[in-house]
Amino acid sequence: MVRRTKEEAQETRAQIIEAAERAFYKRGVARTTLADIAELAGVTRGAIYWHFNNKAELVQALLDSLHETHDHLARASESEDELDPLGCMRKLLLQVFNELVLDARTRRINEILHHKCEFTDDMCEIRQQRQSAVLDCHKGITLALANAVRRGQLPGELDVERAAVAMFAYVDGLIGRWLLLPDSVDLLGDVEKWVDTGLDMLRLSPALRK
């Protein structure tokens, strides 16, 4: 009985997340209410509050779902024991771009995060949440780049802090550009070129040296 109740709770949580995704995609995060999400999910607002305190936690759940399939590669590139951290980063970026183009749900969630998540005054918690996510991502990229430097895959004089900012900006900007103008960039056909462009920047740019 306990197991069944737990499974039902997990199913309800998944329903709520799916409904939030649909509502955010249609209306934007700021214009969507928890009542809108409850109606789409076929649950009460009380059921939503059982799983999530506010919209910020729902946005975080969507963001977490994006990271699930990439987590093992991210952890590998950040590990000091990994022999090929730059190779793991390359595989990770290829996976990120391929999923963006080929998986409709991944595309919708990225669309929400990039173009439908307004940082208005009443959305300050979501702004803080996104700031924290960017800083966490920066920390992970910095660790991966430092590992690649130690393994001789990147220049010893690479400024890993500055390089991490540049790499995040490159990837995030390319995703945002493709979402806005998908026909202007062959992200799938040229995916290896786009990834290697970013990695070449790390290897070759004098401006990223100490």
From Swiss-Prot:
InterPro entries according to UniProt: DNA-bd_HTH_TetR-type_CS, Homeodomain-like_sf, HTH-type_TetR-like_transc_reg, HTH_TetR, Tet_transcr_reg_TetR-rel_C_sf, Tscrpt_reg_MAATS_C
PROSITE patterns documented for this protein: HTH_TETR_1, HTH_TETR_2
Gene Ontology molecular function: any one: transcription cis-regulatory region binding
Keyword entries, A-Z: DNA-binding, Repressor, Transcription, Transcription regulation
Function, in words: Probable regulatory protein for the ttgABC efflux pump operon. May function as a repressor.
SUPFAM superfamilies, per database record: Homeodomain-like, Tetracyclin repressor-like, C-terminal domain
Name of the protein this chain belongs to: Probable HTH-type transcriptional regulator TtgR
A family per Pfam: TetR_N
Coiled-coil regions, chain positions: none
All copies of domain HTH tetR-type, residue ranges: 10-70
Portion annotated as DNA-binding: 33-52
Transmembrane regions listed in the UniProt entry: none
